[in-house]
């Protein structure tokens, strides 16, 4: 019986899963929005929320914990600066998952996972400038 086994294997080894989620959480904080499969987005959400909570704590130990997981020091700086300020008054629910349909090649359910304050017009203006 499979009772009380949480988490999905996603057809990968445990080390591959860990590496994939580290890359995905780094990309999420860097771009504030990523497109992935619905299952990966659902597994990524609690990891991202814990990282944002570390950013809101803001002490040295929390920064080192985030650096041990997130792959880029610049992204950690953004997490502890911009993103932590953005969610300072929010208790949780920092990310949003939007289902977008299916992928053409293999019919996989696709979703967008984004930070709650994400605004497309602001993101487009920052990439153009």
Swiss-Prot record:
| KW Transmembrane helix (keyword) present | no
Task: List the SUPFAM superfamilies.
Answer: Prokaryotic ribosomal protein L17
Question: Any transmembrane segments, and where?
Answer: none
The species this protein was found in: Desulfotalea psychrophila (strain LSv54 / DSM 12343)
Q: Which Gene3D superfamilies match?
A: Ribosomal protein L17 (3.90.1030.10)
Q: Which HAMAP family match?
A: Ribosomal_bL17
| Cited InterPro entries | Ribosomal_bL17 (IPR000456), Ribosomal_bL17_CS (IPR047859), Ribosomal_bL17_sf (IPR036373)
GO CC list: cytosolic large ribosomal subunit
Q: What GO molecular function annotation could you give as one example from this UniProt entry? A: structural constituent of ribosome
Q: Which GO terms describe its biological process?
A: translation
- What name has this protein been given in UniProt? Large ribosomal subunit protein bL17
Task: Give the family from UniProt.
Answer: Belongs to the bacterial ribosomal protein bL17 family.
Keywords from UniProt, A to Z, are: Ribonucleoprotein, Ribosomal protein
